Amino acid sequence: MAPTMRKSHPLLKIINGSFIDLPTPANISAWWNFGWLLGVCVIVQIATGLFLAMHYTADTSLAFSSIAHICRDVNNGWLLRNLHANGASFFFICIYFHIGRGLYYGSYLYKETWNIGVILLFLVMATAFVGYVLPWGQMSFWGATVITNLLSAAPYIGPDLVQWIWGGFSVDNATLTRFFTFHFILPFIIAAMSMIHLLFLHQTGSSNPTGLNSNLDKVSFHPYFSFKDLLGFIILLGALAILSTFAPNLLGDPDNFTPANPLVTPPHIKPEWYFLFAYAILRSIPNKLGGVLALLLSIMVLFLMPIIHTSKLRSLMFRPAAKAFFWALIANTIILTWIGGQPVEDPFISIGQIASGLYFLIFVLIIPTLGLLENKLLKI
């Protein structure tokens, strides 16, 4: 009997091995759906972004007007713009759930997959940052000025580095043009890196909620999980459609409806909501270089996870003490997100400093120590 085409064709058998006959642990929950949803987000963002790029003009005198033109004059341009802007928010919601699941169930022990994932997070954050500058509103301009200025904290090369990125002595036309270039190319790099992420994942297979070896109990990805994933897909696209049509500006900043003006500083410069936790950590340290390092370390701490895993158990499912501190970390990150959106005054400064300290403490000290303690208590 001749093998089916999907198993014999050189290209189709790669797709078959990744999405159809892929052996998948039978007990994975809905938390394993987010990786697939991130793929959907990348496709939605690239599709809407391509059509927006056809009508956008990367010039300081025309950028703001070109966004207004897209929303008013282009067929369904308002929808494309809203889907793209809010799609970024859903992208980050999925990313944070995906990382949270990885931390909870010990997925970081697949080191290559995890490290590629953290690099992907940096790439997505860079893409979102340069994309936020493109409408050339007040918050776009001042956000770009403040964040790029942080590079001046680098010893010796800092000031030159900032001018090199700006393409001049301030954020101007050269900056906007290069940011548009980066915003256009980075999603394709993200798509390529996602393939590598999957390649490494399929070397080991998926983890599962118990953290045990699941080779004894696997089912094919299709039809079981392909249909199960459709539920998340419908919820994601449904929520994105509702937000983009009924409350498209809910997550945006009102200041961005004002064209960029280098002579007027907005009262509170803040990034989009998905960067607020890192922004709060940056602001909680009075020293500029210290703040920049803390900002970088708030994400780079994820690289340490496979190294500082001390427990003999993989998943937090059977680790009640560590589980409690995992949820404390989640609550702490939500507090940091809230603080990042508040003005720099007491009590927000001190709350931010305590929350920032706890963030690093839970990651690098409390959870690893609890791992050793639990090993002793369980005599393993």
From Swiss-Prot:
Annotated heme b b562 binding sites: 84, 183
Record: residues binding a ubiquinone: 202
Keyword terms of this UniProt record: Electron transport, Heme, Iron, Membrane, Metal-binding, Mitochondrion, Mitochondrion inner membrane, Respiratory chain, Transmembrane, Transmembrane helix, Transport, Ubiquinone
InterPro entries (alphabetical): Cyt_b/b6_C (IPR005798), Cyt_b/b6_C_sf (IPR036150), Cyt_b/b6_N (IPR005797), Cytb/b6-like_sf (IPR027387), Cytochrome_b (IPR030689), Cytochrome_b_C_euk/bac (IPR048260), Cytochrome_b_N_euk/bac (IPR048259), Di-haem_cyt_TM (IPR016174)
Regions that span the bilayer: 34-54, 78-99, 114-134, 179-199, 227-247, 289-309, 321-341, 348-368
Single GO MF annotation: metal ion binding
List of residues binding heme b b566: 98, 197
Signal sequence extent: none
UniProt-listed SUPFAM superfamilies: a domain/subunit of cytochrome bc1 complex (Ubiquinol-cytochrome c reductase), Transmembrane di-heme cytochromes
Cofactor: how and how many bound: Binds 2 heme b groups non-covalently.
Domain of life assignment: Eukaryota
GO annotations of cellular component type: mitochondrial inner membrane; respiratory chain complex III
Function: Component of the ubiquinol-cytochrome c reductase complex (complex III or cytochrome b-c1 complex) that is part of the mitochondrial respiratory chain. The b-c1 complex mediates electron transfer from ubiquinol to cytochrome c. Contributes to the generation of a proton gradient across the mitochondrial membrane that is then used for ATP synthesis.
Additional observations: Heme 1 (or BL or b562) is low-potential and absorbs at about 562 nm, and heme 2 (or BH or b566) is high-potential and absorbs at about 566 nm.
Similarity section: Belongs to the cytochrome b family.
The protein, known as: Cytochrome b
Native species: Rana dybowskii
